[in-house]
Regions:
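Histidine-centered phosphotransfer motif of kinases
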Residues: 205
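Broad phosphate/nucleotide-binding scaffolds in NTP-utilizing and phosphate-metabolizing enzymes
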Residues: 1-197, 202, 210, 214-235
Length: 235
């Protein structure tokens, strides 16, 4: 695709219109309770907004230490909207299979059922937190690769809290060059880490687009957004 189209599509990764900070705080309060909500300080305006959720920077008290965290919050009514759209898609698949017999071999209805299962998992942030936690444990000794820590006391179905990462997206090539970071080496490292996790652990990040990979100040690769992970059975 053209570079111009690519830049427009990049906006879908983390630059969609956000919902208000007031709504965000209400969702956090409803999910975590008043006491936990009161322990969150410096709750920022949204720093990134995608189709399903948006992210705010904040601080929490972690056993006496103030930690910078990222709080991911599902969009209001997103589950309802997705279910309505999937129901419409299911009806469409049923009508196609009923009217065009040859399409039954495509198993369109089964595909829509699978899509519904996947999206239901992605819209319960506890599943993402569990995936991130497993990924963290698997990779904590991998040099040059860091998975943010999950804070379970600040995590629920609609809210996910993890370590804040100061980093540069791998899409920002000019900034990385200014920081004397070798882009070719980073690309090779990403591939090697991906293969290592898939082969060694049988568990890997399955959505490694530019918006989900950061390079921190130490030149380490930091993946974010663990809603889509892959698993391979070990031989």
């Amino acid at each position: 695709i053209s570079e111009d189209l690519s830049k427009h599509l990049e906006k879908l990764q983390d630059k969609l219109p956000p919902f208000s900070i007031t709504e965000a705080k209400e969702i956090v309060k409803k999910n975590l309770g008043q006491n936990m909500f009161n322990s969150i300080i410096n709750f920022s305006e949204p720093v990134a907004a995608a189709s399903i959720a948006q992210v705010h920077k904040a601080q929490i008290d972690d056993n006496g230490t103030i930690k910078d965290v990222a709080i991911k919050i599902l969009r209001p009514d997103i589950k309802k909207k997705f279910n309505e759209e999937i129901d419409a898609l299911m009806l469409f698949a049923y009508l196609i299979e009923s009217s065009i017999k040859k399409t039954k071999r495509l198993k369109l209805i089964e595909v829509v059922f699978l899509l519904k299962e996947i999206t239901n998992h992605e819209m319960d942030l506890r599943f993402e937190a569990a995936a991130a936690n497993e990924y963290y444990e698997n990779t904590k000794n991998d040099a040059g690769f860091i998975v943010p820590k999950i804070y379970w006391n600040y995590t629920s179905e609609d809210v996910l809290t993890l370590d804040w990462v100061d980093g540069v997206s791998i899409r920002e090539k000019d900034i990385l060059k200014e920081k004397n970071i070798n882009i070719e080496n980073i690309a090779n490292d990403i591939i090697q880490h991906f293969l290592r996790h898939a082969v060694r652990d049988g568990f890997f990040h399955a959505d490694m687009h530019q918006g989900n990979l950061l390079i921190n100040e130490n030149g380490q690769i930091v993946p974010i957004d663990f809603g889509i992970m892959g698993r391979l059975d070990k031989l």
